[in-house]
Swiss-Prot record:
Keywords: ATP-binding, Ligase, Magnesium, Nucleotide-binding. The keyword Magnesium applies. It catalyses: (E)-4-coumarate + ATP + CoA = (E)-4-coumaroyl-CoA + AMP + diphosphate; (E)-4-coumarate + ATP + H(+) = (E)-4-coumaroyl-AMP + diphosphate; (E)-4-coumaroyl-AMP + CoA = (E)-4-coumaroyl-CoA + AMP + H(+). One of its GO terms (biological process) is phenylpropanoid metabolic process. Belongs to the ATP-dependent AMP-binding enzyme family. This is 4-coumarate--CoA ligase-like 1.
Length: 552
């Protein structure tokens, strides 16, 4: 039974926390696609800059040009590449102007965009392609060697077809993007029947249960998240803002919270292909960037960078951070260095299209370090006791559960994981947290055992599976270890077979060949056994506690 309501926290007598923000209704038209909503902006501000590459002399598109590019690309994908409603199209590329153009073109056809990390190995990419059932790859020539074994048609966003051909079988189908869209007219676009409830994207996340799974996100999920993310700007009647996007567009935050949400409002997106702190500051200066979403290591770099004074960063008025809490000392240093900027933290996950809560300091709330802000409009939450599932009032820690129009439909082709995560309409995040008396959400721990390296999630189960595939390894466990720059790094405790002469370097190289750089083991320790319960479950938290207290 729920306790008495606490209106100041948004906590009702039914045990549900509701947003303290004004309502931000989602478009009611069931036939509205995310691309439809986006392209309305071309009618409202056709000559305003929509997208631009961060580097000097890079490509740029106005909203009118964005509309033309999206629809022309959609026509070409349909008529020349055979993309049909429901087909999955894989995007494998760094951030660039053409990345969102292609994603929006895919969704304009009623097809499904599935994104993948360019740092993935061929094995990891092939696994996702197989699971998503992708029929086409959009990429750049430098990444073609990673997909050479897939035998799928390839569209190259750059013009280096010769380099790409050298890595592909002789009978491979390779088309330059410029050739694909040559002579195509946006007027030839014929919109297929698309509903808000149709799948728009399949983004892969380790989620709440470990192994990577395809998160099914609909047009409605993107539309709802866009309203949630931008409603504060609307309430303050802000003019168009300029957002720098260096967080990867293959990730839900870069794709949904930054790129789609801000474009739908009429804000400009500056696409940065690779993060470098000096390049970031140059881009802020060159494009007069107003809004910067970061992860904690970048915030720390900004706070400590000795050359920040060389650049004119006065245009910045908003610095947002997610993925992990910012320490009070870091927040204070950044606030001093950027006195005219709001320093804001938020919380979200792929399964919620990137957003759950966000700080809004201007609302007069007392600033609480470690808070991820209040629920965005339209999201409801409950905190449940992990043993009894009882709803908990403010200032009591339990599992964070949420529901709202931004919540995923489930995991692709994985009923078991879906039923484990979504129960009676509530998404169980796997995170422990609480709301204070003012409705601010604090995330204090993780039920799930993911390792957070900067903005990336690493599933220990994946690395453990690879370790156990080695013929000389009998048992293994992977846990997070604190790191000042990355937040957490993966380390392993390994049980060797009796006659093995494996070294730490041997194990690290074995893993390095099979995973993206951020999943590489930073340390390997050989032990006689892995601590487990009577039922055989790894006592991971016990091991983490021992390691951090230097007892192991």
């Amino acid at each position: 039974m729920a306790s008495a309501s606490v209106p100041a926290a948004g906590y009702g007598a039914d045990g549900v926390y509701r947003s303290l923000r004004p309502p931000a209704p989602v478009a009611s038209d069931p036939g509205l696609s995310l691309t439809d909503l986006l392209l309305r902006r071309a009618d409202a501000c056709p000559s305003a800059v929509a997208l631009a590459d961060a580097a000097a002399g890079g490509r740029a598109l106005t909203f009118a040009e964005l509309r033309s590019a999206v629809l022309s690309t959609a026509v070409a994908l349909s008529s020349r590449a055979g993309v049909r409603p429901g087909d999955a199209v894989l995007l494998l590329a760094p951030n660039c102007v053409l990345y969102p153009v292609c994603f929006f073109a895919v969704t304009a056809l009623g097809a499904v965009g599935t994104t993948v990390n360019p740092d993935y190995t061929p094995r990891e990419i092939a696994k996702q392609v197989s699971d998503a059932r992708a029929k086409l790859v959009i990429t750049i020539s430098a990444l073609v060697p990673k997909i050479a074994g897939l035998r799928l048609p390839v569209i190259l966003l750059d013009d280096d077809a010769n380099a790409a051909a050298a890595s592909l079988p002789p009978d491979a189908t390779v088309t330059l993007y410029t050739n694909l869209v040559a002579g195509v007219k946006e007027a030839d676009y014929r919109r297929p029947p698309i509903k808000q409830s149709d799948t728009a994207a399949l983004l892969y996340s380790s989620g709440t249960t470990g192994d990577s799974k395809g998160v099914i996100l609909t047009h409605r999920n993107f539309i709802a998240a866009a309203r949630m993310v931008t409603s504060d700007q609307d309430e303050r009647r802000e003019g168009p803002n300029v957002f720098l996007c260096f967080l990867p567009m293959f990730h839900i935050f870069g794709l949904s919270v930054i790129t789609y949400a801000q474009l739908h409002r009429g804000n400009a997106i500056i696409a940065m292909s690779r993060f470098d702190i000096n390049s970031l500051m140059e881009a802020v200066q060159r494009h007069r960037v107003t809004h910067l979403f970061c992860v904690p290591p970048v915030i720390i770099a900004l706070a400590k960078h000795g050359k920040a004074g060389k650049y004119d960063l006065s245009s910045l008025k908003f610095i947002g951070s997610g993925a992990a809490p910012l320490g009070k000392d870091v927040m204070e240093v950044v606030a001093k260095k950027f006195p005219d900027s709001e320093i804001v933290q938020g919380y979200g996950m792929t399964e919620t299209c990137g957003i759950i809560s966000l700080e809004y300091p201007e609302k007069g709330q007392a600033r609480e370090f470690g808070s991820t802000g209040t629920l965005v409009s339209g999201v409801e939450a409950k905190i449940v006791d992990i043993k009894t599932l009882k709803h908990l009032p403010p200032n009591q820690v339990g599992e964070i559960c949420v529901r709202g129009p931004n919540v995923m439909q489930g995991y692709f082709n994985n009923v078991q994981a879906t039923e484990f995560t979504i129960k009676q309409g509530w998404l169980h995040t796997g995170d422990l947290g609480y709301f204070d008396g003012g409705g601010q959400l604090f995330v204090v721990d993780r039920l799930k055992e993911l390792i957070k390296y900067k903005g990336f999630q690493i599933a220990p189960a994946e690395l453990e599976g690879l370790l156990l595939s080695h013929p000389e390894i009998l048992d293994a466990v992977v846990i997070p270890f604190p790191d000042a720059k990355a937040g957490e790094v993966p380390i392993a405790y390994v049980v060797r077979s009796p006659d093995s002469s494996l070294t730490e370097v041997d194990v690290q190289k074995f893993i390095e060949k099979q995973v993206a750089y951020y999943k590489r083991l930073k340390r390997v320790t050989f032990v006689g056994s892995v601590p487990k319960s009577a039922s055989g479950k790894i006592l991971r938290r016990q091991l983490i506690a021992q390691v951090r207290s230097s007892k192991l």
